[in-house]
């Protein structure tokens, strides 16, 4: 019975999960590690990760190391349990897109 918004670490639903997110569009494969509340919406994690890597969040997706897409309409805790902590960020505008003329 943890209070909503309480900072109690280890309380059910009040813990944190960490993700190592790798930017796949960069040949050097840079990564960042984020620690977020389990109950955080994964859409917020996706948006934050994209902004940290300076790529547009509206056209980005997160996949597993096996290439499986992740539905962002779930909590960060669910994603962590289903897919683990190591994920990849892909700016979707680079996947199969033609270069736009200037």
Curated annotation (Swiss-Prot):
Q: Nuclease: is it a keyword of this entry?
A: no
Instruction: Give residue ranges for the propeptide.
Output: 97-102
Placement of covalent cross-link Glycyl lysine isopeptide (Gly-Lys) (interchain with K-? in acceptor proteins): 96
Q: Which GO terms describe its biological process?
A: protein ufmylation; response to endoplasmic reticulum stress; reticulophagy
InterPro entries listed in its UniProt record: Ubiquitin-like_domsf, UFM1
UniProt KW keywords: Isopeptide bond, Ubl conjugation pathway
| CC annotations in GO | cytoplasm; nucleus
Superkingdom, according to UniProt?
Eukaryota
The reply on keyword Cell division is no
* One Pfam family it belongs to: Ufm1
Q: What function is annotated for this protein?
A: Ubiquitin-like modifier protein which binds to a number of as yet unidentified target proteins.
Family per similarity comment: Belongs to the UFM1 family.
Q: What is this protein called?
A: Ubiquitin-fold modifier 1
């Amino acid at each position: 019975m943890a209070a909503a918004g309480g900072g109690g670490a280890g309380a059910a639903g009040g813990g944190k999960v960490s993700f190592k997110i790798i930017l796949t569009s960069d040949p050097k494969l840079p990564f960042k590690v984020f620690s977020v509340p389990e109950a955080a919406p994964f859409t917020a994690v996706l948006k934050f990760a994209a902004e940290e890597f300076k790529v547009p969040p509206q056209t980005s997706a997160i996949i597993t190391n096996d290439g499986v897409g992740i539905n962002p309409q779930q909590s960060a805790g669910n994603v962590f349990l289903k897919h683990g902590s190591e994920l990849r960020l892909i700016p979707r505008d680079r996947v199969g897109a033609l270069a736009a003329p200037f």
